């Protein structure tokens, strides 16, 4: 687990930077179950042996410098991956997706599964290439990302027709919220 307390890309309501702290505070109530958690429905124990969850703290964010903050994020994710661990990143706004995905370039043919109301495929919203409205477009530009599946898309006004056309031309699978409601999740 690593926190990325960054929300400078947020255009409306800030506060996502407090996400890592909030999750840690809430999870501290359940920190006593070192042997894992038993699920009576599945009749299985989760997050017990051999799993080990490590809190790596927060990425160093310089709240006036997006580039350096994103470099710090990318470096932290690369370090976690180099230890053969799976990073679970707590944000932060959608803009943090880009440096996180960039760090995964040690793998080939990755598929990104994106749950969101918005397409996040804008070219450079408000002149910002690595903002919260464009991480899926940035992902499509990365050689190690071979597929993007977007689930729950419904946000009218968050993307233009050309953004949807570009996403479809890239090969994204777009499943709208209406399709999810109609077809269910199984």
Question: Positions of the model-derived regions?
Answer:
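Conserved alpha-helical scaffold segments that buttress catalytic/binding sites
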Residues: 1-186
